[in-house]
């Protein structure tokens, strides 16, 4: 949130033979000051920073916000197509992305708020399953942090959660809840739309 959750993955990834780097980020409302952190990664890897593109997609952070219903999610994805196509064109042509918004709010949310938010709110201890869990292991497979294991055929969360919500939003039986905060909320996961 306001700094992408897989920061360590990106900063540790080797980019062999690359000279330039573009960052394409999706979000439910805004990416905050993520461009600053992307620029830092580019500098750290001795790459020419070509900018950060923001693609608005359906919200999936149901520990705090509401995800849209399926039809509304489809509209949001459809509305993102022009921004996606512009992004593709800029990369194909080797052009930098236009500068992203960088105001006081963005710097505040990505700066002092972000570490406090992660320290006190981004915890896995509120995740739980109900009796509809079928022990399929989808949550284990979908976790980018390898933070979930099946114990006695039920998911157990470790301490490396980034709140990506893949476990809760991809659960085929909607058996996972984040305390009471997610109860009754629609789950969002990407649904491929037919492109023109």
What are these regions (language model features)?
Residues 188-195:
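Active-site-proximal loop/hinge segments that shape catalytic or ion-binding/gating pockets
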Residues 27-28, 133, 161:
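Short loop or secondary-structure boundary microenvironments that flank
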């Amino acid at each position: 949130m306001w700094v992408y959750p897989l920061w360590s993955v990106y900063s540790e990834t080797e980019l062999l033979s690359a000279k330039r780097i573009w960052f394409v980020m999706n979000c439910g409302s805004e990416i905050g000051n993520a461009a600053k952190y992307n620029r830092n990664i580019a500098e750290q890897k001795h790459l020419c920073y070509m900018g950060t593109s923001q693609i608005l997609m359906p919200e999936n952070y149901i520990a705090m916000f509401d995800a849209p219903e399926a039809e509304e999610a489809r509209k949001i994805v459809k509305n993102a197509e022009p921004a996606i196509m512009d992004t593709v064109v800029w990369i194909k042509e080797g052009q930098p992305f236009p500068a992203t918004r960088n105001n006081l709010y963005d710097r505040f949310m990505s700066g002092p708020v972000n570490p406090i938010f992660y320290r006190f709110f981004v915890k896995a201890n509120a995740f739980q399953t109900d009796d509809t869990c079928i022990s399929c292991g989808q949550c284990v497979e979908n976790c980018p942090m390898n933070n979930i294991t099946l114990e006695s055929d039920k998911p157990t969360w470790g301490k490396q959660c980034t709140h990506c919500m893949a476990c809760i939003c991809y659960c085929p039986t909607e058996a996972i809840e984040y305390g009471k905060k997610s109860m009754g909320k629609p789950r969002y996961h990407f649904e491929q739309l037919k492109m023109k």
